[in-house]
């Protein structure tokens, strides 16, 4: 009562949030007359003006009002669409890192342009995440006109793109793409062997369209990049023969509510007998460790037969089992169930069984999107999941008011006793509304149900369209016609999310359909296409007015979904932009949701009222009962997702550590934290200064590279010894520019250092100073990483062999001598055994190891030594990480059994997973150092040749990508710039690197040696 009164006085949290934004909306409106006076060029110049303000210290909030006003004005000119005031509010909500709940037809696609434009001004990239490739392409092409008008670039990432296309798309200011692609590209980047091959930039800001579908419905779906695993396909087919001989309740217990099935004692005995007859069982006990794989396959085959239904959970097409998304009704192309379940379903359906795979990299959507520095989303249905959005993603939901009041009528549910009676009533209702000319969208929960209704309508001779996983090719065209007079569309939940159903029909899509039927292209005949659109638009407008008179679009739901959101999405197809509409659900006690969760209560109510089978019950109590059942399912699913997230957080922390380590190796940087006395990180970074020897080694190369990659290279002949002055004088002689990209690539290929030269190509001295400072520092950091690795190995060796609790005479000196020899290929003198305390021993061992490494550097050189170190480290890390993923999967599979020992499985998983990870990292360090010190000079040269060959291959591929990308961007008739040969240098001339030495004593000598 008190809460109700407070809301009445102060408004809901949504209303208060919107009130706070109103002054900014009014300020944007006041700017409109002034902006209308600007020319297109003046309006475009505002983008550069905003960027300059940000560079001078302004925040995005400081420029929000003018930026939104400019975006609105540009939209009017480029798209012929003006943002409503409520859309401006939606844009502010998205910019603030919240979820904007907007009704269907309120223009979410256009709303996203406001925060996209504002945040893209930072130059760090904005990702707009959609649910499918079609929407990504459509929105990028459509909204790209607006961004291009304002001087920003737009990219789109979809499946089947090459590396060059992906890199180009991610370098754009705004990038559209499907959720899976962003995830897989993140994983692929973290499997690459060169930082120059990365597609993505650091994840900065994402706007997730249909955020509930991606962050809630698909939260449990892991993205997995797999490699080939062990072969066991024949075993699935053999064990599958056992399942049809097992009976429910007698041999197994099926719990549909918990989505689980378990063998009974009698079922285990029967299975053992049948498996033995098939010669699959080893011994007589199914639970013997030697039969663990057999037991696992048996359980998966049992699940496949009892819990997974054809044309509901999956469909079979072209001899393949394709998963159907339970929330959208779409086929999930390329997806496979993990843990052998997909193979079990393939065995059940008697199609070719694909080999089991091995996980190479994996991440869930929950953890992927939490990597972004800022995240926001939009959908028509988020408020029912507001608690989960806040607890998992720290995202608040704000309900945006509609531009026009919603006048759709939502009727109470009709509940029948049997499914047969329900479908009879559904068909009668469809025919009745069809005769009136009212368009009808029939919503079903599965391919099976939509096909059944379609068959009945076909028998009655009623023309209709079907939209499901089997008939999805012309989805956009089907949805375009769904609002036409008398149209009947039978659809699963996929009913065109992202595509509005317009009363009277979508004129543009209908024109495209007509062109398609005539094998014509709109792009080839733009004037004819526009004329056709205008002609059809008149027809659609007149038809739309007629439909409004008879009640608008009629939504007929044939079953309640487990989630209220999915039902609300179906209802939301009608009543867009103030149009009339109707929605009603027809249910039966045999529906899955009713049968499992609410059937008994409603059945008792119907029996008490003495209602016949063919008469439905329609009452608010029944609707409330169904909603309560849905709430129970939603709460259960939330608990499942929350539990899975807690497990996945363990892997997430480990993944982040490995990927950060891998990335720092690839870019050639290392900045470790300072540790306290207990060995815990303090949060402060250790300061590493470049070694003088490395400075002297590297700096001559900077001048050499500048001469090599200048657009008009000449040889600096000054001999005053000041390299910087030599560079300055040489590049002052004429206006020259440096080919930064090629110079960066050369530095990376040779030294393994990725340097971002953000200065302009004509600022040669700044480039020289930056490279002269960063290259020696990065190489010193790489060397420091190796020394730290050696230090940790020695520390672990001393800790294990010489524990503080034992006197020195009881220490394992044999372990110390052997361990040092194995790791550093050096024999220790006998007098080491006279040292009596751990600290002194560790210091002595470290000094000897460091001297051994310095000797190794003298033999093979600093550059080659560090290149081999990086190569070995990446190789060992990747191999160990893949093995670790498999080990963690096995740990996860069996951890539930710890509960029988009165232990918390979750805590045990965290503890054991951490120990496994620490041991894995230590093992990698040990292997890397051992291999590095065992490399002799001859083998080092072979290693270098292999690394260089791999680098050249990647370099060539990158150049081919660059050429392909460059050629696409060349205007017609343009010629690419000619390649400039490097000028010949006489051996006695001064080396162009600026060292002051003769060429034949410096880099000329190197060329001779490698020729």
UniProtKB/Swiss-Prot annotation:
Its cofactor is Zn(2+). SMART domains: SecA_DEAD, SecA_PP_bind. Its EC number is 7.4.2.8. It catalyses: ATP + H2O + cellular proteinSide 1 = ADP + phosphate + cellular proteinSide 2. GO terms for cellular component: cell envelope Sec protein transport complex; cytosol; plasma membrane. May bind 1 zinc ion per subunit. CDD domains: DEXDc_SecA, SF2_C_secA. ATP binds at residues 87, 105-109, 500. It is a peripheral membrane protein. GO terms for biological process: intracellular protein transmembrane transport; protein import; protein targeting; protein transport by the Sec complex. Keywords: ATP-binding, Cell inner membrane, Cell membrane, Cytoplasm, Membrane, Metal-binding, Nucleotide-binding, Protein transport, Translocase, Translocation, Transport, Zinc. Residues 969-1011 are annotated as: Disordered. InterPro entries: Helicase_ATP-bd, Helicase_C-like, P-loop_NTPase, SecA, SecA_CS, SecA_DEAD, SecA_motor_DEAD, SecA_preprotein_X-link_dom. The keyword rRNA processing does not apply. It is found in: Cell inner membrane; Cytoplasm. GO terms for molecular function: ATP binding; metal ion binding; protein-exporting ATPase activity. Part of the Sec protein translocase complex. Interacts with the SecYEG preprotein conducting channel. Has a central role in coupling the hydrolysis of ATP to the transfer of proteins into and across the cell membrane, serving as an ATP-driven molecular motor driving the stepwise translocation of polypeptide chains across the membrane. Monomer and homodimer. Part of the essential Sec protein translocation apparatus which comprises SecA, SecYEG and auxiliary proteins SecDF-YajC and YidC. This is Protein translocase subunit SecA. It comes from Sorangium cellulosum (strain So ce56).
């Amino acid at each position: 009562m008190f809460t109700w009164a407070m809301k009445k006085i102060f408004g809901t949290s949504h209303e208060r949030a919107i009130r706070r934004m109103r002054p900014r909306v009014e300020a944007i409106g006041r700017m409109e007359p002034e902006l209308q006076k600007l020319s297109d060029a003046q309006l475009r110049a505002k983008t550069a003006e905003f960027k300059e303000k940000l560079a001078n210290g302004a925040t995005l909030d400081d420029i929000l009002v003018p930026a939104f006003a400019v975006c609105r004005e540009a939209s009017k000119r480029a798209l012929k669409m003006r943002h409503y005031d409520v859309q401006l509010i939606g844009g502010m909500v998205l910019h603030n890192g919240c979820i904007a709940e907007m009704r269907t037809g309120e223009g979410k696609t256009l709303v996203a342009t406001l925060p996209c434009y504002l945040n893209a001004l930072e130059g760090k990239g904005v990702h707009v995440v959609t649910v499918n490739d079609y929407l990504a392409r459509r929105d990028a092409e459509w909204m790209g006109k607006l961004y291009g008008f304002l001087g920003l670039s737009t990219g789109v990432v979809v499946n089947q793109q090459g590396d060059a296309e992906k890199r180009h798309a991610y370098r754009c200011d705004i990038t559209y793409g499907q959720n899976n692609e962003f995830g897989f590209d993140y994983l692929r980047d973290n499997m690459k062997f060169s930082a120059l091959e990365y597609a993505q930039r650091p994840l900065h800001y994402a706007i997730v369209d249909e955020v509930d579908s991606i962050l809630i419905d698909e939260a449990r779906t892991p993205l997995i990049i797999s490699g080939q695993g062990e072969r066991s396909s024949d075993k699935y087919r053999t064990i599958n023969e056992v399942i049809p001989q097992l009976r429910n309740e007698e041999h197994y217990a099926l719990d549909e509510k918990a989505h689980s099935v378990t063998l009974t004692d009698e079922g285990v005995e029967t299975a053992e007998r049948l498996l033995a007859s098939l010669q699959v069982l080893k011994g007589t006990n199914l639970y013997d460790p030697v039969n663990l794989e057999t037991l696992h396959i048996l359980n998966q085959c049992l699940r496949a037969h009892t819990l997974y239904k054809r044309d509901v959970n999956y469909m079979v097409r072209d001899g393949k089992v394709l998963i159907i998304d339970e929330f959208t009704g779409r086929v999930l192309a390329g997806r496979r169930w993990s843990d052998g379940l997909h193979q079990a379903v393939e065995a059940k359906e008697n199609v070719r069984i694909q080999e089991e795979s091995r996980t190479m990299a994996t991440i869930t959507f929950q953890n992927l999107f939490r990597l972004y520095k800022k995240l926001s989303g939009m959908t028509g249905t988020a408020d029912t999941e507001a608690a989960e959005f806040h607890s998992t993603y720290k995202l608040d939901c704000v309900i945006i008011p509609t531009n026009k009041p919603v006048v759709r009528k939502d009727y109470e549910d009709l509940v029948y006793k049997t499914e047969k009676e329900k479908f009879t009533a559904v068909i009668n209702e469809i025919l009745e509304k069809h005769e009136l000319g009212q368009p009808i969208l029939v919503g079903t929960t599965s391919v099976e149900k939509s096909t059944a209704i379609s068959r009945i309508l076909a028998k009655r001779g009623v023309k209709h369209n079907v939209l499901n996983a089997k008939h999805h090719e012309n989805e956009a065209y089907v949805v375009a016609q769904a609002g036409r007079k008398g149209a009947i569309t039978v659809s699963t939940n996929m009913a065109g999310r992202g595509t509005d159903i317009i009363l009277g029909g979508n004129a543009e899509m209908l024109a495209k359909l007509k062109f398609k039927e005539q094998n014509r292209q709109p792009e080839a005949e733009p004037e004819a296409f526009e004329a056709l659109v205008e002609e059809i638009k008149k027809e659609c407008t007149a038809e739309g007015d007629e439909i409004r008179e008879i009640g608008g679009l009629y939504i007929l739901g044939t079953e309640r979904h487990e989630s209220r959101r999915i039902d609300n999405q179906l209802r939301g197809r009608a009543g867009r932009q103030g149009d009339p509409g109707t929605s009603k659900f027809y249910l039966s006690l045999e529906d899955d949701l009713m049968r499992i969760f609410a059937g008994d209560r409603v059945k008792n109510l119907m029996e008490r009222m003495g209602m016949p089978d063919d008469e439905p019950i329609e009452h608010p109590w029944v609707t409330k009962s169904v909603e309560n059942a849905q709430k129970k399912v939603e709460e259960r699913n939330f608990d499942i997702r929350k539990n899975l997230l807690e497990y996945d957080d363990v892997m997430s922390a480990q993944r982040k550590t490995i990927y950060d380590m891998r990335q720092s190796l690839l870019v050639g940087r290392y900045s470790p934290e300072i540790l306290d006395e207990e060995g815990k990180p303090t949060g402060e970074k250790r300061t590493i200064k470049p070694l003088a020897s490395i400075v002297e080694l590297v700096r001559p190369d900077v001048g050499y590279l500048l001469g090599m990659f200048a657009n008009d290279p000449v040889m600096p002949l000054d001999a005053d010894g000041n390299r910087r002055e030599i560079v300055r004088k040489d590049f002052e002689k004429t206006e020259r520019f440096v080919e930064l990209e090629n110079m960066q690539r050369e530095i990376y290929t040779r030294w393994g250092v990725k340097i971002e030269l953000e200065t302009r190509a004509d600022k040669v001295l700044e480039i020289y100073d930056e490279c002269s400072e960063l290259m020696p520092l990065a190489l010193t950091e790489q060397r420091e990483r190796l020394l730290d690795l050696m230090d940790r190995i020695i520390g672990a060796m001393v800790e294990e062999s010489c524990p503080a609790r034992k006197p020195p005479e009881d220490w394992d000196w044999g372990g110390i001598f052997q361990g040092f020899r194995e790791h550093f290929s050096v024999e220790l003198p006998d007098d080491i055994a006279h040292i009596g305390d751990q600290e002194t021993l560790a210091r002595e061992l470290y000094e000897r190891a460091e001297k051994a490494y310095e000797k190794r550097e003298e033999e093979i050189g600093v550059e080659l030594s560090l290149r081999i170190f990086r190569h070995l480290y990446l190789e060992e890390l990747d191999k160990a990480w893949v093995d670790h993923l498999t080990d963690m999967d096995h740990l996860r599979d069996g951890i539930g059994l710890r509960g029988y020992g009165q232990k918390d499985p979750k805590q045990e998983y965290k503890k054991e997973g951490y120990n496994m990870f620490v041991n894995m990292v230590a093992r990698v360090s040990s292997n890397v150092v051992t291999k590095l010190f065992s490399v002799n000079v001859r083998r080092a040269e072979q290693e270098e040749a292999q690394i260089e060959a791999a680098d050249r291959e990647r370099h060539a591929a990158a150049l081919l990508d660059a050429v392909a990308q460059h050629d696409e961007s060349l205007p017609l008739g343009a010629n690419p710039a000619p390649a400039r040969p490097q000028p010949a240098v006489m051996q006695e001339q001064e080396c162009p690197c600026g060292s002051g030495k003769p060429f034949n004593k410096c880099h000329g000598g190197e060329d001779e040696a490698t020729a």
